[in-house]
Swiss-Prot record:
Changing residue 862 to V: In n1649; slight fluid accumulation in the pseudocoelom. Belongs to the protein-tyrosine phosphatase family. Receptor class 2A subfamily. Disulfide bonds join 189-255. Keywords: Cell membrane, Disulfide bond, Hydrolase, Immunoglobulin domain, Membrane, Neurogenesis, Protein phosphatase, Signal, Synapse, Transmembrane, Transmembrane helix. InterPro entries: FN3_dom, FN3_sf, Ig-like_dom, Ig-like_dom_sf, Ig-like_fold, Ig_sub, Prot-tyrosine_phosphatase-like, Protein-Tyr_Phosphatase. Expressed in muscles, hypodermis and a subset of neurons. Expressed in the AVA neurons, with high expression in the anterior half of the preanal ganglion where AVA neurons contact the PHB neurons. Residues 23-712 are extracellular. Changing residue 1013 to G: Failure in quaternary dendritic arbor formation of the PVD sensory neurons. This is Receptor-type tyrosine-protein phosphatase.
Length: 1409
């Protein structure tokens, strides 16, 4: 029976196998036939259709019924086929945002699954649920590398699931499942779902050898290093730590997981072994300069193969230079660096890590490489010049550098023929670390520079004072115990310009026989060592006989004026009391005479007079002298500085490169020599820094005898002059009371009023006037007037007339409510008269005047800002005068004071009197806003617009909207927002850019322009003056600012209200001439960049373009044509020329006194890269510190977001200050641009051990705790989420969050980043995050090693990127210029400037094309 049963089963099995084989055979045959047929049909094509992604059903995904089937934060999503899939946040890839739906402006999305996932699986895409991104389950095993924290398993884990029913567990061990005795081991039980609310802490345990239950030592619900629970990490693992593993720990380990709310019970088992290791002994390392030999012995018989890994310890991380496995003794390691520390890691080769130890050694030293040249520059401290030399350690120091030697040697550039020794300037007194070596070996012990005295491997020394007319070459050596390096001859030099002689001898006076003149003899002309002398001026100071020379100012400080003004001023009694005396230029010569006579009006024969005025303003006036006075004076020597210093060839053995030096600015000079063109001296004096003047002391005073007392002049002085003075005093007192009571006189005596007005006009015309200034002289004129705290500007401004014309309409009490200020009245002759309403005689008044621009090219209406009572009148004026453009140069409120009533609506249609105003559009920019309105007059809109009833019903928008479209007008309002009352803008760039935009509008050129500030006189008058003077400059190549402002004041009183505004007119025009319009449209930027990159000899510009409006030259082309010619023969590109324009500056550099204080010196990494006092970040006071307000950081005004440019911390103390700044400024975004390998541990302000660690800065009383919450590594940057708590600030909530973006694509030895694209991506990410912080006004902190170089590039590109997004315009030059004015050492290299252009051009090319 049993046999039959076996036979029956065997038969069934054979039949089944036969059937299966047959089916496989026929199926294979059919497939082969089909394949052959397809091959014939597709002979020319070999394309294979890819596998179709599998659906959820094909993958066997369980269908969920509700969210109860899903893990914590999971959601059950049903597809079109009704199949439900659990989705959860944990299954999302790293690129998916954690949160979503917060930004109402740009709703954030959850992106897509990665490409690999979508190519294999056709499952629902990520979506937003409860403000969290949820994703479909994973299906591929997850590989965890040995370096991936916190697990470091070097193994695979289960794919993440979202359905509770998919619960599974896997057992793993670290570092291995087979280890040596004594090793610390961690066993893991890792599940594939989120355990929150599903798996309890005690529901997972380990069972050893099937009998011993061992509880986990750590679980996902426990905090890690004080942070939040780890349940939200990517993997959920229970851990069993086994310290000092023994053989008794060997065996099988089963992980068992039981779900608390269901009957799910899953397990996984692994085998774990503890064994005894083999060892090696007597391992030795024998190093030389370039290699090392490693030998060892093995225990227990045959040679044992080991693994060796050699790490060079030149930084905190180290670099692996040798790594091989399964090596036997001996081993030779070659190509090592001399005098370099190394660490040899020795380990077993059987994978069980039976042993692991290290061996440290250092290779032998040899002579170092030369030091690396960093930079050389000339610095101007205000009192003297110094040469700053910067260098870095050699590329291969080959040992410990014990000394550096620096030689700064200055040779004459232009010799006067005498044998002058080279100058060896000493190190500046404030820096005791440095010394200038003269090359004498006997002094090398004393003149070496010890590198220990410097904080890092960047060295900087200053040498001075420098002598004029010198070329200082720089050479640096490095020395270690093996010897001294070859010299590093720097390619850059410190070149000093010409200067005045060190001493000018005092002239000797001689009295002439006629007692009405006197002579001067000159013992010896000054030497030309400091530069060729171009002119000699003889200055004379007349004084009353009883005035002593002791009260005179120094000869170089006395005010110079005309002959008549000097005598008038110096003879006043008040001049002696106030010690205020003037001097005048009597004679001038190209060559110094041996003797000359003053007062005879005759110049020394055969000697030419100077063709250049003193200070470009004062000519010689050798007029007859007055007798009875005392005369003194001095000799002035003028030396013209060279504007350019041409390059010299180094390779031919000539002088080393000479680099251009601008004394007014600490920048790297450019190598130049004096041009050989026969340029006259006076043309060379228009260089912005001006010529140098040397002054002698006052010569001994000489007294001219008085005339007879019976002479007519004596009678005049004794009798008539006192009477005239009394008459002038009485007239002044009378006019004072007349002015005080002017309103009474104008009411009761109209005739007297007219006479008074006429007299005032005629009297003001008698004041001193100032002529037109050529365009080329505008910068020089500004510099000259700006000296001595704007003395000449103040004198010119005080000469402006104050017209007192009739203001009857403004003075009426019925119109008092329509005036914002009592002293700002509208002249009757030029006031705007509105149409009267219902016969009301006072309804035609508004405080506004017609203003004619230069030669009446435009018509302005200068108005006060509307008050609440005049908003309707304001719009009525716009309608009646047919104005289509309003220019507003004030803010609604300034310093908590209303400057202007808000006269426009933002959203709803609004009625102002008889004018309907409908908002059409608006846009906001950094310095201005543009609004458009459609307005209509009620009387011209037809009877159906306004319904019967009161005005309140008019607000019914549906009734009004669309009724007056045919009768409406489009009005533009350009609102400049960066100008405070009674002041001038800090920088002219924003206003000029705003004005360029206006000058391109037809509404600005062809219709009346309504312009207002608050009073309608100060900022309004300044704006009109600049615009009109631009027209005059373009038409006549000159500007008569004084005359035009006088004409303005004839049309409206007090136009240009302050000296500061008057000075700004000059400054704006001067900078317009110096820099031109560098603002480009985005669409033209690439072509503009290509033109700049071309050599000037290959490009030319045509200026034949005509304006389509009035036939004149268009403003854009005219502005370009006003600058110097764009076609030169020097071979430089336009970009290089534009970069050199950055060196031009009308003002002196700002001070950095606070950074130079003794207590702050150690807080600066580089002495030249410190914040200006005006823009430095001021820290709040700290208890226990006398002065703790300083940090090397500067405020930078941004476009939408402000910035702080800071240097990297230099110590733990400055790292604490860095966090104090972050807390005080409420910073949430930090950008780090320096290479982390350059940082020492004491400089880092974040935990260096990565995610989950913390660090502490400060003292017990004042401290900050910083925690690294997470760390994400990307291709070119690292994102760290940091959390900090300030101990001394109880008002600040704990655990404030800061995101740090650490850019890794910028090598420390590179001037610019490796990739413009990677930096642009980082900028976009930073700005996108900053814009997502709703309502945050906190600045973005950007820091690098010196706080200027890399930070300047990042901020510059950020500003340019934001502006091209908002305005579609780019201005690299002015953006860089603005940054340089906020912090020193920004954009000192041409490569940095060129990189900004290239980065924007590449971005625009990819974005707009």
């Amino acid at each position: 029976m049993r046999i039959n049963r076996w036979i029956w089963w065997a038969t069934v099995i054979l039949l089944y196998l036969r059937t299966g084989l047959a089916a496989d055979f026929f199926r294979s045959s059919e497939e082969n036939d089909r394949k052959s047929s397809d091959d014939l049909d597709n002979f020319n094509s070999t394309k294979i259709e890819p596998d179709k992604p599998k659906t959820a059903k094909e993958l066997g995904v369980k269908s969920c019924e509700s969210n109860q089937d899903c893990v914590h934060d999971g959601v059950c999503h049903r597809g079109n086929d009704g199949h439900g899939i659990c989705m959860c946040p944990r299954s999302c890839p790293a690129i998916t945002p954690k949160q979503c739906g917060y930004n109402y402006r740009t709703p954030s999305t959850c992106l897509l699954m990665d490409a690999d996932y979508r190519s294999k699986y056709d499952v629902k895409e990520p979506t937003c649920y409860s403000r969290k991104c949820v994703c479909p389950p994973q299906f591929d095993d997850v590989h965890v590398t040995a370096n991936q924290k916190p697990l470091r398993l070097n193994s695979t884990l289960l794919p993440t699931k979202c359905d509770k029913r998919d619960l599974a567990v896997v057992a793993r061990a670290h570092p291995s499942t087979s280890v040596s005795k004594g090793i610390d081991v961690t066993l893991f039980c890792c599940i594939n779902v989120d355990p929150e609310g599903f798996i309890d802490v005690a529901s997972v345990f380990f069972i050893q050898n099937g009998t011993i239950m061992r509880e986990a030592t750590s679980h996902p619900f426990a905090p890690r290093n004080g942070l939040a629970r780890r349940v939200h990490e990517k993997y959920s693992c229970w851990e069993l730590e086994i310290k000092n593993a023994q053989t008794s720990d060997s065996g099988s380990y089963m992980c068992r997981v039981t779900a608390s709310a269901s009957d799910l019970d899953v397990t996984d088992t692994m085998q774990f072994e503890v064994k005894a290791p083999r060892q090696i002994k007597n391992l030795t390392v024998n190093p030389s300069e370039r290699d090392a030999i490693v030998t060892w012995e093995s225990e227990g018989g045959e040679d044992m193969a080991i693994d060796l890994r050699l790490v060079r310890r030149t930084d905190t991380r180290g670099q692996v230079v040798f790594s091989k496995d399964n090596l036997t003794s001996p081993v030779s390691i070659k190509d090592l660096r001399a005098a370099t520390p190394y660490t040899l890691f020795v380990s077993g080769n059987n994978g069980q890590v039976p042993f692991e130890f290290t061996e440290h050694f250092t290779t032998k030293q040899k002579r170092p490489f030369p030091p690396k040249e960093e930079d050389v520059r000339v610095l101007n401290s205000g009192s003297a010049l110094s040469c700053e030399v910067e260098w870095k350690s050699p590329a291969e120091p080959n040992g410990r550098i014990t000394k550096y030697f620096v030689s700064v040697r200055g040779a004459m550039r232009k010799s006067d023929g005498s044998l002058t020794p080279d100058d060896l300037p000493a190190a500046v007194e404030v820096d005791k670390r440095c010394a200038n070596w003269d090359g004498d070996e006997n002094t090398s012990k004393h003149n070496g520079i010890n590198p220990i005295d410097f904080a890092n491997e960047f060295y900087s020394c200053k040498f001075g004072p420098l002598k004029p007319n010198r070329n200082y070459t720089v050479t640096v050596w490095a020395e270690n115990s093996a010897g001294r390096s070859l010299p590093a001859v720097f390619h850059k030099n410190c070149v000093t310009n010409y200067a005045q002689p060190d001493m000018v001898e005092t002239p000797q006076p001689l009295l002439s026989n006629n007692h009405s003149t006197f002579s001067l003899t000159f013992p010896q002309p000054p030497d030309d060592i400091n530069g060729p002398i171009s002119c000699y001026y003889i200055a004379i100071v007349p004084l009353p006989a009883n005035v002593s020379l002791d009260i005179l100012p120094k000869s170089e400080e006395i005010v110079m004026h005309s002959f008549s003004k000097v005598f008038t001023n110096n003879l006043l009694p008040s001049s002696a009391e106030e010690k205020r005396f003037f001097a005048y230029i009597a004679e001038s010569y190209v060559q110094l005479p041996e003797e000359t006579t003053i007062g005879d009006g005759v110049r020394v024969s055969d000697l030419k007079a100077c063709n250049v005025q003193y200070l470009s303003r004062y000519s010689s006036e050798d007029l007859a002298l007055r007798r009875g006075l005392k005369y003194t004076g001095f000799l002035i020597v003028r030396v013209d500085k060279e504007e350019e210093l041409n390059r010299k060839d180094v390779r031919n053995g000539a002088d080393p490169n000479i680099f251009r030096n601008l004394i007014d600015k600490s920048v790297s000079p450019t190598s130049r020599t004096r041009t050989a063109s026969p340029m006259s001296r006076h043309l060379r004096q228009l260089h912005l820094s001006g010529p140098a003047y040397g002054y002698s002391a006052y010569f001994k005073p000489i007294l001219l005898d008085t005339e007879s007392s019976s002479s007519g002049f004596g009678i005049f002085m004794k009798i008539i002059l006192p009477f005239l003075l009394f008459l002038a005093f009485a007239t002044g007192v009378t006019m004072f009371f007349v002015n005080r009571k002017g309103h009474m006189l104008s009411t009761w005596c109209p005739l007297f009023t007219k006479m008074t007005s006429k007299d005032v006009v005629e009297r003001t015309l008698l004041k001193q006037t100032f002529g037109a200034i050529p365009v080329d002289d505008l910068p020089t004129e500004y510099v000259v007037r700006h000296r001595d705290t704007d003395f000449l500007f103040a004198q010119e401004y005080e000469s402006l007339p104050h017209f007192q014309l009739d203001t009857v309409a403004s003075n009426r009490k019925e119109n008092a409510i329509k005036n914002r200020y009592n002293d700002i009245r509208a002249f009757d002759d030029t006031r705007v008269k509105l149409k009267k309403i219902n016969g009301d005689d006072y309804s035609d008044y508004i405080n506004a005047n017609f203003i004619k621009s230069w030669k009446e090219k435009k018509l302005f209406i200068a108005a006060q800002a509307p008050v609440d009572a005049t908003i309707g009148d304001f719009w009525r004026m716009v309608w009646e005068q047919e104005s289509y453009l309003i220019v507003m140069v004030a803010n609604l409120t300034e310093k908590n004071r209303q400057q202007c009533a808000k006269y426009w609506p933002d959203e709803q249609i609004t009625r102002y009197g008889d004018i309907i105003v409908e908002p059409a559009s608006f846009s906001f920019h950094s310095d201005y806003a543009i609004r458009a309105f459609d307005i209509a007059h009620i009387g011209e809109c037809g009877p159906d617009v306004i319904p019967n009833g009161n005005g309140v019903e008019y607000a019914n928008v549906p009734i009004v909207k669309g009724q007056f479209a045919n009768n409406s007008r489009r009005i533009l309002q350009y609102h400049f927002t960066n100008w405070n009352d009674y002041k001038a803008p800090e920088c002219s760039t924003g206003l000029l850019r705003f004005m360029y935009r206006l000058r391109e509008l037809p509404q600005f050129n062809n219709s009346p322009v309504v312009i207002h500030c608050s009073a309608g006189v100060g900022r309004t008058g300044t704006f009109i003056s600049i615009d009109s003077m631009l027209d005059q400059c373009l038409a006549e190549d000159k500007a008569n600012i004084f005359e035009f402002v006088c004409n303005l004041r004839r049309q409206r009183n007090l136009m240009v209200q302050s000296l500061e505004q008057y000075v700004f007119i000059y400054k704006a025009l001067a900078e317009w001439h110096m820099y031109g319009d560098t603002d480009e449209d985005v669409r033209d930027f690439e072509d503009h960049y290509q033109r700049l990159c071309a050599s000037n000899r290959d490009r030319a510009v045509s200026f034949n373009q005509q304006s389509s409006t009035n036939g004149s030259i268009s403003p854009r082309v005219a502005i370009v044509s006003s600058r110097e010619s764009m076609t030169t023969s020097n071979g430089e590109t336009g970009l290089e020329e534009e970069f050199k324009k950055l060196e031009r500056n009308l003002t002196t550099p700002l001070s950095s006194n606070f950074a130079a204080k003794d207590e702050n010196l150690l807080k600066n990494r580089y002495e030249a890269a410190v914040p200006f006092d005006k823009y430095r970040v001021i820290l709040p006071p700290t208890i226990g510190h006398a002065d703790s307000s300083y940090i090397n950081a500067s405020h930078i005004k941004g476009y939408f977001f402000d910035y702080i440019a800071a240097q990297d911390p230099v110590s733990e103390g400055t790292a604490f200050d860095f966090w104090r700044m972050i807390a005080d400024q409420n910073v949430t975004t930090v950008v780090m641009l320096s290479d982390e390998t350059d940082w020492s541990d004491v400089e880092k302000y974040w935990p260096i051990d990565g995610s989950g660690t913390e660090c502490h800065f400060g003292s017990e009383r004042n401290s900050v705790n910083v925690t690294c919450v997470s760390e994400e590594h990307h291709q070119d940057f690292i994102i760290r989420n940091l959390s900090y708590s300030m101990k001394d600030n109880e008002s600040m909530p704990a655990n404030q969050e800061v995101v740090q973006y650490s850019y890794t694509g910028w090598p420390s030895d590179s001037i610019v980043p490796k990739s413009a694209n990677s930096l642009m991506n980082l900028i976009e990410m930073v700005l996108q995050r900053q814009s997502s912080l709703m309502g945050s006004q906190a600045p973005i902190v950007v820091h690098c090693r010196n706080g200027s170089s890399e930070s300047g590039i990042f901020i510059c590109i950020s500003l340019l990127w934001l502006r091209q997004k908002a305005e579609q315009r780019i201005d690299v030059f002015q953006t860089v210029k603005g940054l340089q004015s906020h912090r020193p050492m920004m954009f000192t290299r041409f490569e940095q400037y060129s990189f900004c252009y290239r980065a924007l051009a590449d971005y625009i090319s990819k974005t707009y094309r």
